């Protein structure tokens, strides 16, 4: 078992503190859910962990290796952002080997969810199809830890259920942190759940705590 250890994360924008003394651990074999209202800093936290944004303070390590730059994160952390990142003119089948080892490349080529997209360039895909392709490339990548920012956004119930199944399958040998406003889908598959609220990250033990912290209405 490997551990991604995130500690002492602080981040401010324009004098306003977004994240304060954040601590979170992700282990291979587990899915960690990250919940919070819009604008609380969930995406910023994932960007700091991925190395695309620098915190005012941060301490991030994978097992005994402190992660300082992008090279340190190579093959350790893969990040699915909310924005599209794949090159528009390249066919999906040609992108898969760039992200995945031989074994996972073969698995992806046989996966029903992506089969219809293999011979298409990204520019020809719908918004939903692009999200499917990008999510699968990240999930099946060589990285040990996966960060997913709004992976279910825009998906049909059928596609969401299939993506949940794949996330759970990949978590058997990877550590996954997932953030999505569709909290039911996150809670359904998460082994541990954290709530980001008022700049702090709180470990959530049961559904009632989400109500106590005013993330969910008391009537639910």
Give the residues covered by each predicted segment.
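ABC ATPase NBD coupling module
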Residues: 54, 64-78, 214
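Conserved structural motif at the start of ABC-family nucleotide-binding domains
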Residues: 4, 19-21
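Helix-to-loop junction immediately C-terminal to a conserved catalytic motif
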Residues: 50
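Conserved ABC ATPase "signature" region
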Residues: 103-120
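The feature captures the beta-strand-to-loop junction immediately N-terminal to the Walker
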Residues: 35-37
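Q-loop/switch helix immediately C-terminal to the Walker
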Residues: 79, 83, 88-104
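Conserved beta-strand-loop-alpha-helix hinge in the C-terminal portion
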Residues: 200-220
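Walker B catalytic motif
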Residues: 150-151
């Amino acid at each position: 078992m490997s551990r991604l250890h995130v500690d002492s994360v602080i981040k401010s924008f324009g004098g306003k503190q977004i994240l304060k003394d954040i601590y979170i651990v992700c282990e291979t074999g587990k899915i960690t859910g990250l919940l919070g209202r819009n604008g609380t800093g969930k995406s910023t936290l994932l960007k700091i962990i991925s190395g695309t944004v620098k915190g005012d303070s941060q301490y991030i390590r994978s097992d005994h290796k402190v992660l300082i730059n992008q090279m340190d994160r190579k093959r350790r952390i893969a990040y699915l952002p909310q924005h599209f990142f794949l090159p528009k003119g390249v066919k999906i089948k040609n992108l898969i080997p760039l992200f995945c080892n031989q074994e996972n490349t073969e698995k992806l080529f046989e996966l029903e969810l992506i089969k219809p997209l293999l011979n298409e360039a990204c520019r020809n895909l719908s918004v939903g199809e692009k999200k499917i392709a990008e999510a699968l490339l990240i999930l099946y990548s060589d990285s040990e830890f996966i960060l997913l920012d709004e992976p279910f956004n825009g998906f049909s119930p059928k596609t969401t259920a299939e993506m949940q199944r794949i996330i759970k399958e990949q978590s058997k040998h990877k550590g996954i942190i997932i953030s999505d406003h569709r909290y039911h889908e996150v809670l359904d598959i998460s082994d541990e759940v954290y709530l980001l609220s008022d700049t702090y990250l709180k470990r959530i033990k049961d559904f009632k705590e989400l109500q106590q912290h005013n993330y969910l209405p008391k009537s639910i």
